[in-house]
Amino acid sequence: MAAKDLLNKGLLLHGIGAGVLKSVTNKIAEMTTSQSMKMDITATTEDVYGGDGLFPLYTYISKKEGNVEITNAEFKLSQVQIAQGTKITTGGKRNYRVLLTKASKNLIDGASLTGVETIAVIDPDGNDASKNVTVTETGGVTFGEGAAEGEYAVWFKATDANSVRAEMLKNAMPEVATFNWMFTTEDSEGNKYQIDIYARRVRADGELKIETERDKATAPSLKIKILDPGDGHDDFAVVTVTPLAA
């Protein structure tokens, strides 16, 4: 199909497709279960007036902005490392909550725990019981003489070799990345096309929201800003349309 035919080809924009962000240090966020992707290019114009005329003699663009917002159906740690300046480590600590009585000798019977850190010990009346309950680094429990009868709730952390930890650093900026998106669509006659969207340099806006709610699945979003392409390039964003074989 000739270029002039594609330029004037009307396409139905539906479906979501998939995308990937790759930072300058090779951090990757792949998005294959998104709910929506929106790219918004805006411009600020300035008018120049002269003489007695009421219409501007000239108008020019003083500023351009490009933004992409992606709403995902699933939460991924890779999204956190793109949205924030992060340090990723493995073998982090996992939170636990267990219920114990004065007869308990271990936080979890039969479990091998290491690196235990007590968060809170709550007595049967809902008060702090940390003075009456001792917890060891390997999960052993000892109740003092002053401990009352009843059920105790113990919150603690323990090392888990399978955990992955994303530390959000207070003075770190989100990394510059490239943005690629692709989806398949069709024209009114049913012919298939692929649309690719590319931005050479982008950076997340630093916003991160994690929300949980009973009986509801929430959709985390990622907002990124398109930057000047730099390095002598003029194309800050590119849209490519390709006809697909039947």
Per-region residue spans from a language model:
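Short N-terminal helix-initiation segments at or just after the protein's N-terminus
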Residues: 2-18, 159-172, 246
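Solvent-exposed edge beta-strands and adjacent loop segments
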Residues: 2-82, 132, 195, 199-221
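Beta-strand elements of well-folded, non-transmembrane domains
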Residues: 41, 72-76, 158-160, 183-189, ...
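Short secondary-structure capping micro-motifs at structural edges
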Residues: 54-58, 139, 162-169
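Beta-strand secondary-structure signal
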Residues: 67-71, 153-155, 178-180, 221-225
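Extended beta-strand solenoid/passenger and fiber regions
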Residues: 76-134, 158-193
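Mixed-charge, glycine-accented linear interaction segment located at domain edges/termini
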Residues: 121-125, 135-137, 143-147, 194-246
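Small/polar beta-strand repeat architecture
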Residues: 145-164
